[in-house]
Amino acid sequence: MNEALDDIDRILVRELAADGRATLSELATRAGLSVSAVQSRVRRLESRGVVQGYSARINPEAVGHLLSAFVAITPLDPSQPDDAPARLEHIEEVESCYSVAGEESYVLLVRVASARALEDLLQRIRTTANVRTRSTIILNTFYSDRQHIP
């Protein structure tokens, strides 16, 4: 993935980031290339790991996740192995786990149905990973999943 992107690759990556369902024909028009050239470039971007997959964006509220929160976690015993991400990976309500610099070791993005469900989840996180937690409930999301592609 060290190979630099040329201008055409950047166009294709920007277009795919904006609409992962864009057809090869649409991409070809936007990039000024033939469909076969675009297909070859997209395959190369995929094999290099620049394009890592295609997925649908689901509205969390539409599937019953009415409450989202950031949960910062810190191991209770720093002398023990730092394996919190692996211990929490199976918990479905944990959408993302980020290693961070600062007071906490990790920040989790969690989605649950209610405040009570968050309380239960926090207890599971504490018990499963032997961590302390600090939660911030998300009131409104103005934007997310933005990708800057120079």
UniProtKB/Swiss-Prot annotation:
**Pfam families the UniProt entry points to:** AsnC_trans_reg, HTH_24
Superkingdom of the organism of origin: Bacteria
| Molecular function terms from GO | sequence-specific DNA binding
Which cellular component terms (GO) are annotated to the entry?
cytosol
Keywords assigned: DNA-binding, Transcription, Transcription regulation
Annotated region of DNA binding: 24-43
Up-regulation conditions: 15-fold induced by starvation.
Q: What are the residue boundaries of the HTH asnC-type domain, all occurrences included?
A: 5-66
Q: Name one GO biological process term.
A: response to amino acid
Q: Which InterPro entries match?
A: AsnC-type_HTH_dom, Dimeric_a/b-barrel, Tscrpt_reg_AsnC-like, Tscrpt_reg_AsnC/Lrp_C, WH-like_DNA-bd_sf, WH_DNA-bd_sf
User: What activity regulation does UniProt give?
Assistant: The DNA-binding activity of LrpA is modulated by interaction of LrpA with various effector molecules, including amino acids and vitamins. The DNA binding affinity is decreased by several amino acids, including phenylalanine, tyrosine, tryptophan, histidine, leucine and aspartate. Preferentially binds to aromatic amino acids. Besides amino acids, the binding affinity is also reduced by vitamins, including B1, B3, B6, VC, B7, B9, B12, VA and VK3.
State where L-phenylalanine binds. V100, G102, E104
Question: Quaternary form?
Answer: Homohexadecamer in the absence of any added ligand. Homooctamer. Tetramer of dimers. In the presence of phenylalanine, the hexadecamer dissociates into an octamer, which further dissociates partially into lower-order oligomers.
- Entry's free-text remark on domains: Contains an N-terminal DNA-binding domain, followed by a rather long linker and a C-terminal effector-binding domain, which is also involved in oligomeric interactions. The ligand-binding loops of two crystallographically independent subunits adopt different conformations to generate two distinct effector-binding sites. Amino acids like phenylalanine, tyrosine and tryptophan exhibit binding to only one site, histidine exhibits binding to both sites.
State any further remark: Can complement a M.fortuitum lrpA mutant, which is attenuated in virulence and persistence in a murine infection model.
What is the recorded function of this protein according to its Swiss-Prot or TrEMBL entry? Answer: Transcriptional regulator that probably plays an important role in M.tuberculosis persistence. Regulates the expression of several genes, including lat, rsmG, whiB2, lsr2 and Rv2011c. Acts by binding directly to the promoter region of the target genes.
Instruction: Identify this protein by name.
Output: HTH-type transcriptional regulator LrpA
Its taxonomic placement starts with:
Bacteria, Bacillati, Actinomycetota, Actinomycetes, Mycobacteriales
